[in-house]
Amino acid sequence: KFAREGFFVVLTTRNRVNAAALEQAIGAQGGASMIVELDLASPASISQAFATIRAQAGDPEVVIYNAGYLEGRDLPPEKELLEHIPVDMFDTAQHIASRGPFLVAKEVLPAMRKRGGGSFLISNNASSLRGRKRLTGQSLYYPRVMMRTLAQVLTEEYSEHGVHVANVVIDGLIDSPGTRALARAREHPEIVMNPEKIAEAFYYLHTQDRSCWTHELQLTPYSTKPSF
């Protein structure tokens, strides 16, 4: 969506192969993009990645923090409780859901503040709204509450400087080959969310008039009850 609207898009990923198809798709529609490798578990990698971005593309006008992890998903039913969560699994979740956005914000917000504009948008999920028991097959998502809290803090700190910060709660299954393979998605295709429409929601946030900014947006399929 952003590339279609004329933005030069920087795709960050731990391994550039992961973003190659998206880079090709952007090019096929006439857009421009580049891939920069970035490991959220490494502060040095984050600093180097943004140094590369600034050198080759300039300071970002909009940053969408969209990072996920699978930690906890493979634990068996008898290991649902917190006492069975390995510390390294928790650390990985914290790197991505808490420390990661903190370090990325430190890289991009100073330039946005000095410029008097920009957007820092966080892609989150319903587990950021309240603590919930982790069920079998679910990732260790409760650290995402910290991601939402960070968005709230940054909203208070940077709105007056013209920087739009928002937490986007994607409350459902995003369409993908893996999602389509799930039994509940096959039985109820209406619960699957269109990723292009999600992208439009992020673009809407970035282009909002500053007289009426949205700081939290929850996207839920029409056929399911919103999470609270």
What is each residue range found by the language model?
Residues 85-89, 93, 119-146, 152, ...:
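Catalytic loop of short-chain dehydrogenase/reductase
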Residues 17, 38-49:
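The beta1-alpha1 cofactor-binding region of Rossmann-like NAD(H)/NADP(H)-dependent oxidoreductases
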Residues 1-10:
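Canonical Rossmann dinucleotide-binding motif of NAD(H)/NADP(H)-dependent dehydrogenases/reductases
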Residues 160-169, 181-228:
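C-terminal helical subdomain
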